[in-house]
């Protein structure tokens, strides 16, 4: 029985992780956390009976306690789980003794310290939180190596590369080929991007994701963040990572070796596939009967990204190559700008302009620690 802690159980990755748990009787959920969606986590608690729960929002945590006490009196649950709140509660959840693996599906910088706590506690990590590696990859991967902890990628692209490298660790890699769908504006002329609305940006052609990730995909900032993740996950320099637009989202990524061989991972666009592989590695278990039908594919397209049109991707490569604290600046400025765009306070093109402005005025720290990373994040979030 593998015991799972899910940080961010009410989000897109969290709910799909629970779908995988439902399919596998040897997976047991012992920890659930959420920001403030107590309606959903209440139903999850009734179904999965975790031992430990964290609700980040203190007021919502009190409301959840009341509902659980009522449920206990009515016989809906046998035991009320321990409930904590805030950052410290999230860190406790990550290091909870009775879990073997931590799924980090929280969104934002809040995921860094809990991931560090989980690694220090010897937990394997199913990593879905981009910021952990984008901002603190130099810290996380070193610590994981020291503690003998496995980090399994949940992003479809990184999972694909991870799969392509199985049994080939000693082979020389020439390039990591990180695929991208190109988002909803792949074929939109650059001069029309200034008129993009929130509603249009939220319509991804292939994937069902949360709002922020969907917008990040439309600007290709998301792919820039994934390049940074790949740099740390696979210990590869940025100049050996190439982004390839694959509009059908069938080829999830590939690895080119020095002998010229290219190994790619293909499948239907379904996040449950990489989630399941991370939870049950090295096994491949049934996820759904939605299999890839090669005969139904008329073609597979591969397109070089336009770095003038998708300036966010170009800025990401600059930040990653220069390193230090610049990836944190890139991430924080994007997070702040996307939040403003979702609130309809800025235009679509302002997102990338805000990122560029913050990168240009930042004085780089070569080896930022977690305190540096969090300080930079706060300064940018409050300054935008």
Can you describe what each PLM-predicted range is?
Residues 1-384:
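Catalytic, metal-anchored helix/loop core of enzyme active sites in primary metabolism
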